[in-house]
Amino acid sequence: MIVSRIAKTLDHIDTGDVVIFHANAKQDYIKRLIGKPGDSVEYKKDQLYLNGKKVDEPYLSENKKHKVGEYLTENFKSRDLKGTNGNMKIPSGKYLVLGDNRQNSIDSRMDEVGLLDKNQVVGKVVLRYWPFNRWGGSFNPGTFPN
């Protein structure tokens, strides 16, 4: 995996990009950026809504074929997450990340990760070379609204 540290400022990281971040003092995680400061995020019946608009997530299509239960991503709203104080909008300086393997992902939905602080982000993943059958740099198919 190749990571761009140039994008570390988050000025060059967009919703839908895959990022690497410090989850704790010993581990870095790789997850997809779903929400930025000021965004409201909701999952309802396996559908992502970002600021009230439906967002397609084609990168989840393979995982949805193998899900256990009714939904790959359980229903939640950004206001339910630790660090939002019940507000629907993600607070200033915070970021919401989710793993593509939603049913087995330790991500912003879990208190142990929660919403990320800007300084936790190491950079944006720009090239994946493992597994070989998914080699490439297309992590954000352009489905997120600007």
Model-derived features: where do they sit?
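Soluble "head" domains of membrane/secretory-pathway proteins
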Residues: I2-N146
